[in-house]
């Protein structure tokens, strides 16, 4: 009889991962997350980071973190509903509401927590959640926590969405349509105006997870809702503070009613300590910086367009991305992972993405160009893509 403490069942599952070629070890960075990094002791060009604007190591933002620690200490010490709600947390929510051009904002400890806490808080038995089939895992998990019924519509397929809405028009008290603003694996933008039109036509609420749109799309990076001019017509907008903003945390933007309800029923808010002052102070500075200039978003888009053009000219399939996210689609899963490995051996770190994260036969490496990259770095990366692509007969 096996010793239960040896966790033999997990050892067997781990071996299955190794047999399938999808076992991985956590890469170790030796320094800040920038355009070039020290990874496992080797200097490489970084094309895997969500640090879109280069804010994660921005000197002005780092100083704001240090100043906040000096004034407030290193931790909040409690959940916000008890004694963990400092005036700096309130200031952050005011700044974010101004940035997102919404009535109110509720900050959570992560973007994942936003979806885990909000979806279950605003839906219940007798409601229907209608989710794009390619939505982020945190949306899927958040929906699972709700007692509402769930269904999906084909990715960005408005005819299918309308069919689902028609079929369920009179069956539920409330309906909630959920979509990513920008889909992280392909970089495509949700057809949000059409979704909102259908939601209003059939009396449904709209919920947008804008993790990869905030700081990227819209005026000064205000996001997908701003990009399409849909303020006041989207009920819940989720934003992350760990990607373009460069720190940690997430938020829900919407009405005062939304915020009031989540302060009573948002479980991650109620049962987990609030963000530490250093994070809050640095986020405030980052958002103010973003509102004050388009320098960083302009540089991001300039770099993204430059890289896409160069990679496409080599003959790689980069899909139909409408954002800086640039998938280089290889196809067969094993080749995609081998391509990623060879790129790293040649000084470029870019993540291999395979099933079940993407559909079978669409294995890829996902390139994340940032405002922090120089043209020289991007040129070097393109040369490595060309070299490895030719060696593997991909070009």
UniProtKB/Swiss-Prot annotation:
It catalyses: 6-carboxyhexanoyl-[ACP] + L-alanine + H(+) = (8S)-8-amino-7-oxononanoate + holo-[ACP] + CO2. The keyword Transferase applies. Pathway: Cofactor biosynthesis; biotin biosynthesis. The modification N6-(pyridoxal phosphate)lysine is found at residue 243. GO terms for molecular function: 8-amino-7-oxononanoate synthase activity; glycine C-acetyltransferase activity; pyridoxal phosphate binding. Its EC number is 2.3.1.47. It is an enzyme of class 2 (transferase). InterPro entries: Aminotrans_II_pyridoxalP_BS, Aminotransferase_I/II_large, AON_synthase_class-II, AONS_Archaea/Firmicutes, AONS_Archaea/Proteobacteria, PyrdxlP-dep_Trfase, PyrdxlP-dep_Trfase_major, PyrdxlP-dep_Trfase_small. One of its GO terms (biological process) is biotin biosynthetic process. The keyword Transferase applies. Keywords: Acyltransferase, Biotin biosynthesis, Pyridoxal phosphate, Transferase. Its cofactor is pyridoxal 5'-phosphate. Substrate binds at residues 24, 136, 357. Pyridoxal 5'-phosphate binds at residues 111-112, 184, 209-212, 240-243. Catalyzes the decarboxylative condensation of pimeloyl-[acyl-carrier protein] and L-alanine to produce 8-amino-7-oxononanoate (AON), [acyl-carrier protein], and carbon dioxide. Belongs to the class-II pyridoxal-phosphate-dependent aminotransferase family. BioF subfamily. NCBIfam families: bioF, gly_Cac_T_rel, PRK06939.1. Homodimer. This is 8-amino-7-oxononanoate synthase. It comes from Alkaliphilus metalliredigens (strain QYMF).
């Amino acid at each position: 009889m096996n010793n239960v403490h040896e966790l033999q069942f997990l050892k067997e599952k781990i071996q299955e991962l190794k047999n399938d070629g999808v076992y991985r070890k956590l890469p170790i960075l030796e320094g800040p997350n920038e355009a070039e990094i020290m990874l496992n002791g080797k200097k490489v060009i970084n094309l895997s980071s969500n640090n879109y604007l280069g804010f994660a190591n921005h000197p002005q933002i780092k100083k704001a973190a240090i100043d906040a620690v000096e004034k407030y200490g290193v931790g909040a010490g409690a959940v916000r509903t008890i004694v963990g709600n400092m005036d700096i947390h309130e200031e952050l929510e005011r700044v974010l509401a101004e940035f997102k051009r919404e009535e109110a904002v509720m900050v959570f400890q992560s973007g994942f927590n936003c979806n885990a806490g909000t979806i279950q808080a605003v839906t219940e038995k007798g409601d229907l959640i209608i989710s794009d089939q390619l939505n982020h895992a945190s949306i899927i998990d958040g929906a699972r926590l709700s007692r509402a019924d769930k269904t999906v519509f084909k990715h960005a397929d408005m005819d299918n969405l309308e069919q689902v809405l028609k079929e369920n028009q009179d069956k539920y008290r409330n309906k909630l349509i959920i979509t990513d603003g920008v889909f992280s694996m392909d970089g495509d933008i949700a057809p949000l105006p059409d979704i909102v039109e259908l939601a209003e036509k059939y009396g449904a609420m709209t919920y947008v997870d804008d993790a990869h749109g905030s700081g990227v799309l819209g005026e000064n990076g205000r996001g997908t809702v701003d990009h399409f001019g849909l303020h006041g017509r989207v009920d819940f907008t989720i934003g992350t503070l760990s990607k373009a903003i460069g720190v940690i945390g997430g938020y829900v933007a919407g009405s005062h009613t939304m915020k009031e309800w989540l302060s009573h029923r948002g479980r991650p808010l109620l049962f987990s300590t609030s963000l530490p002052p250093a994070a809050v102070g640095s986020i405030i500075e980052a958002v103010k910086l973003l509102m004050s200039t388009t320098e960083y978003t302009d540089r991001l888009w300039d770099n993204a367009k430059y890289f896409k053009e160069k990679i496409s000219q080599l003959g790689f399939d980069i899909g139909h991305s409408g954002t800086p996210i640039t998938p280089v689609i290889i196809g067969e899963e094993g080749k995609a992972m081998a391509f990623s490995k060879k790129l790293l051996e040649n000084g470029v770190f870019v993540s291999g993405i395979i099933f079940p994260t993407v559909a079978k036969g669409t294995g890829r490496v996902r390139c994340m160009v940032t405002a922090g990259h120089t043209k020289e770095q991007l040129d070097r990366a393109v040369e490595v893509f060309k070299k490895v692509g030719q060696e593997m007969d991909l070009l």
